[in-house]
Amino acid sequence: MLVSMLLIIFPNGVSLSTPSLSSRNKFILRSRSSRLRFSARSFLSSASRLVNSSKMTLAFERLLRLRRVSFTKKFSSSDEDKSRDVRRRLRPASEATGAFAVRGADCAIAD
């Protein structure tokens, strides 16, 4: 089995990695406020936008706007259950802070 690792660190502190490009493992996107998982297929189909752009962070945000991406985000609440599922859609919130916001529907969020 070929074992390789992809790690991209963006200027705003967001990192993108995958344990193995040869398997069905999912990409993991980390920012200061969230951890996102999505399939390699959905990312690689538009990866050329990242490679060909001098401003990789902006290109990645454009990619996220174009694609519906499944992800997992950690959260907890003292008043509610520690774990719940919510359907959301990812939207980059701030390039400066590396934060991500969620909007609409399409992604499972779980504690």
UniProtKB/Swiss-Prot annotation:
Subcellular location: Secreted; Host nucleus; Host cytoplasm
Signal sequence, renumbered to the chain: 1-16
Domain of life: Eukaryota
Glycan attachment positions: 52
Keyword presence, Protease: no
Renumbered ranges of motif RxLR-dEER: 88-91
Disordered: region residues: 73-92
Keyword annotations from UniProtKB, A to Z: Glycoprotein, Host cytoplasm, Host nucleus, Secreted, Signal, Virulence
One cellular component (GO) term of this entry: extracellular region
Keyword Transferase: no
Free-text comment on this protein's domains from its UniProt entry: Has the canonical translocation RxLR motif, but lacks the canonical EER motif, which characterizes most oomycete effectors identified so far.
Task of the protein: Secreted effector that partially suppresses the host cell death induced by cell death-inducing proteins.
Family: Belongs to the RxLR effector family.
Name used for this protein in its record: Secreted RxLR effector protein 81
Native source species: Plasmopara viticola (Downy mildew of grapevine)
